[in-house]
């Protein structure tokens, strides 16, 4: 499976989850570069604080993290200019299947909601839906 994405970002405070997702994405060869962040604030600053860096194609963000949560990350992302948002597909990747969480995420246009674990099938469906 190849999608020719330049950059995928994983934002998750769980090191094991990030490691496994990084391995899966590497094995699938879907991106030239994969970056991982354990803190949402650091990820946001690195990705959108420096306007000289190209925006990532895809960002996976967990909802439940210490410090800035995935919901706060989505708020910051949603406040970016539409032209900036249009360059990146945002996907929540979480263990939560609570209806309150899915409803909160649903208020953000164009944000995908996936439950953990990330699998080859889920990745394939996301790529087909958003990048083909």
Task: Please report, for each region that a protein language model flagged, where it lies by residue.
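Short amphipathic alpha-helix used as the core "switch/output" element in two-component signaling
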Residues: 45, 71-84
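C-terminal output helix
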Residues: 118-127
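Conserved sequence signature across two-component system core domains
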Residues: 11-12, 37, 59
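Receiver (REC) domain active-site loop signature in two-component systems and cognate sites
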Residues: 65
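Conserved acidic segment of CheY-like receiver
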Residues: 6-16, 21-25
């Amino acid at each position: 499976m190849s999608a020719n994405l330049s950059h995928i970002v994983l934002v998750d405070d769980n090191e094991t989850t990030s490691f496994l997702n990084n391995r899966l994405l590497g094995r699938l060869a879907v991106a030239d570069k994969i970056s991982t962040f354990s803190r949402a604030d650091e990820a946001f600053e690195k990705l959108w604080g420096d306007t000289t860096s190209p925006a990532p194609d895809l960002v996976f963000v967990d909802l439940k993290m210490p410090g800035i949560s995935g919901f706060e990350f989505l708020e910051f992302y949603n406040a970016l200019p539409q032209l900036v948002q249009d360059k990146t597909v945002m996907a929540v990747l979480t263990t939560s299947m609570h209806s309150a969480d899915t409803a909160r995420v649903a208020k953000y246009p164009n944000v995908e909601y996936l439950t953990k674990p990330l699998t080859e099938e889920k990745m394939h469906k996301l790529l087909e839906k958003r990048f083909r």
